[in-house]
Swiss-Prot record:
Enzyme class: hydrolase
Keyword hit for Hydrolase: yes
Subunit structure as annotated in this protein's UniProt entry: Homotetramer.
Protein name, UniProt field: Glutaminase
GO molecular function terms listed in the Swiss-Prot or TrEMBL record: glutaminase activity
EC number(s) per entry: 3.5.1.2
InterPro entries, A to Z: Beta-lactam/transpept-like, Glutaminase
Example of a GO biological process term: glutamine catabolic process
Keywords: Hydrolase
Membership in a protein family: Belongs to the glutaminase family.
Species of origin: Stutzerimonas stutzeri (strain A1501)
Highest taxon listed in the record's lineage: Bacteria
Record's catalysed reaction(s): L-glutamine + H2O = L-glutamate + NH4(+)
Amino acid sequence: MHALLQEILDEVRPLLGRGRVADYIPALADVPADQLGIAVCSAEGELFEAGDARTPFSIQSISKVFSLVQAIGHRGESLWERLGHEPSGQPFNSLVQLEFERGRPRNPFINAGALVICDVNQSRFATPELSMRDFVRHLSGNPLIVSDTKVAESEYQHRARNAAMAYLMQAFGNFHNDVEAVLRSYFHHCALRMNCVDLARAFGFLARDGICPQGGEAVLSPRQTKQVNAIMATSGLYDEAGNFAYRVGLPGKSGVGGGIVAVVPGRFTVCVWSPELNAAGNSLIGMAALEALSQRIGWSVF
């Protein structure tokens, strides 16, 4: 597997330069664009890696999966009274759809849905930022994970559209806590710095019917695990989820930091990272690497 991963990285590396590093978040614009890493973790905990798999990066929207899992653990099925689990078909930060649907986001992975999830967790935890940090430290087995305060502050200073969504949902009665406090938590989560190895391990419970490989406890029930994987498959890559399903065929979640995590239920979790993004905001080389890996090994849920 190590040799195969290195072979795939060598195969996709010529694509460097065809994408663009996220520049609408100033603190992310400085990330060197030529970095590329991949890690695969089996359901039994065996790890394989290649390239810059241990270089930390800003996980951004990948954090929405961890937030969702925390909220499901707190609210269970009642969580879905406040948001849906359908694909959006609109840009991840659309205000038009949110107003048309009276403040109820389509799913937890568009920004409005992620803010509702953070609002739920704000009501549950006294210190949501520390609760999230400790949660991902436990899932990954890495006690050194931190949030990049420079990135979080940079995102907070450019919060206008996210704030507009939160206040709009508040106007419809679907936002219960202080908007600015929830935004602070949201950006803190997005600014968590993890590497491919951390994320491949942290997502392991989604390949094991909800059982955490690190501690052996149930993070989710088997039914809840299936639900999270299903939402990742339909909505995990914004309006490119269909293309990802077509090319890769696995549940996945991306972030504008250049990371993509994919789950092979019952078998493996994979994380690939390359900071250059395509027009849809997903890692251009990451998509190509996961497609190649899926084709070589025959991984697909379809």
